[in-house]
From Swiss-Prot:
Disulfide bonds join C27-C39, C32-C37, C86-C335, C211-C216, C240-C246, C343-C365, C348-C368. This is Chitin deacetylase 8. Strongly expressed in the midgut. Has little or no expression in other tissues tested. CDD domains: CE4_CDA_like_2 (cd10975). Induction: Strongly down-regulated in response to 20-hydroxyecdysone (20E). Up-regulated in response to juvenile hormone analog. It comes from the Eukaryota. Its EC number is 3.5.1.41. It comes from Bombyx mori (Silk moth).
Length: 381
């Protein structure tokens, strides 16, 4: 109890300090140097020519992992490799409620990236816009510990964040990321910097990125990287950040139309400055639309056989930007290796949610908690 009290006190102090962050100033490329600092820019890292630059593709899925959507992930992702014979990656931004942590462990052991998407994923969206430092410590900082504990994966492997509803929280979320040793955020869409696309950057200095869902950060916050969500363009040239958010699209039964739609958006990157191409989606959209699923699989089949395209975990993009090398050298690098993490599964329940008095069941890689884990009590103690 005493330890908890001390922790709460430290968090309150940190929250108070949150109002004293220095305002970001325009970026000086002579002073802001890799690997730890990069100005927001459409310039290719390392001054590489586009034809010498690896085209990274980041496939991401949001929300909880369960026995239903794991079947889609197994079907479309498992066993894929890039042309350099390294396993193809994908990133899962996982929210806590109804997540099966044994399956999170399975995805991690398959080499996919596990990232944070909040404990509660609560509504309304305005909560996230107005979230305090303390709110985001409990939703994001505590989720890192929760994820590591229940999924039996190293906390050091949890590097990314996506805030629910793509709702920016100003400086606050990035301050929490800096304080909890999180590497990058992939919440911030850009519709203005898509052709050429905006490359990842740090927040040491003022960002040039357009603020689509305010508030956006204005302070100088060394440490966290921004992995921009470069918007797609639908058939009427309207921007969309998530694939399932595009409005004017081919008919959902039109496999060929969707294949061409995906390829057109990909080529904007591939034939341009090769900024990372994101396929940001919710699993339900793939599983409930078989023609779109087939088009998606065809797209992955093509890029997995191109010598200059690499489907990777999102954190790997940041790693490359920190130390940019041309395609020929990148292809010679050793494949990433995930040290297997053992899951000793426990099926727990009914567990009472102290926030709503509902009964929950959960599968975890640890001993069962006394209560259903939630905001303010991430381990269910």
């Amino acid at each position: 109890m005493k330890r908890l009290s001390v922790l709460c006190s430290l968090l309150l102090v940190a929250a108070a300090l949150g109002t004293e962050l220095p305002l970001a100033t325009p970026c000086d490329e002579e002073a802001c140097k890799l690997p730890d600092c990069r100005c927001s820019s459409t310039n290719i890292p390392g001054g590489l020519r586009a034809r010498d630059t690896p085209q990274f593709v980041t496939v991401t899925f949001d929300d909880g992992i369960n026995v239903i959507n794991i079947e889609t992930y197994r079907e479309v992702l498992y066993g894929r490799s890039n042309s350099n014979r390294c396993p193809a990656g994908a990133t899962f931004y996982v929210s806590h409620e109804y997540t099966n942590y044994q399956l999170v462990n399975e995805l991690y052991n398959r080499g996919f990236e596990i990232a944070l998407h909040s404990i509660s994923h609560r509504t309304p969206q305005a909560f996230w816009a107005d979230a305090t430092y303390q709110n985001l410590v409990q939703e994001i900082g505590d989720q890192k510990r929760q994820m590591a504990h229940f999924a039996s994966i190293p906390a050091s492997a949890i590097k990314g964040v996506r805030i629910p509803f793509l709702q920016m929280s100003g400086n606050t979320s990035f301050q929490v990321m800096a304080d909890f040793d999180l590497l990058y955020d992939c919440t911030w869409p850009t519709t203005a910097l898509t052709n050429p696309g905006l490359w990842p950057y740090t927040l040491h200095h003022e960002s040039i990125q357009d603020c689509i869902i305010p508030p956006c950060p204005t302070a100088s916050i060394p440490g966290p990287w921004v992995l921009p969500m470069i918007s797609w363009r639908d058939l009427n040239n309207f921007p969309c950040s998530m694939v399932d958010g595009c409005f004017f699209t081919p008919d959902r039964t039109d496999e060929e139309g969707w294949f061409k739609f995906i390829l057109t958006n990909f080529e904007r990157h591939y034939l341009g400055n090769r900024a990372p191409f994101g396929f940001f989606v919710h699993e339900w959209f793939i599983s409930s639309n078989p023609a779109i699923k087939r088009a998606f699989v065809r797209f992955m089949d093509i890029i997995n056989n191109l010598n200059d395209v690499f489907m990777v975990n999102s954190a790997e993009v940041i790693d490359w930007v920190k130390n940019p090398v041309p395609i020929d050298r990148y292809r010679q690098q050793q494949c990433k290796f995930t040290m297997p993490s053992i899951c000793r599964p426990s099926f727990c329940g009914p567990l009472t949610g102290t926030h709503n008095q509902l009964s929950y069941y959960m599968t975890i890689c640890n001993t069962c908690p006394r209560n259903y884990p939630w905001v303010g009590n991430p381990l269910g103690q």
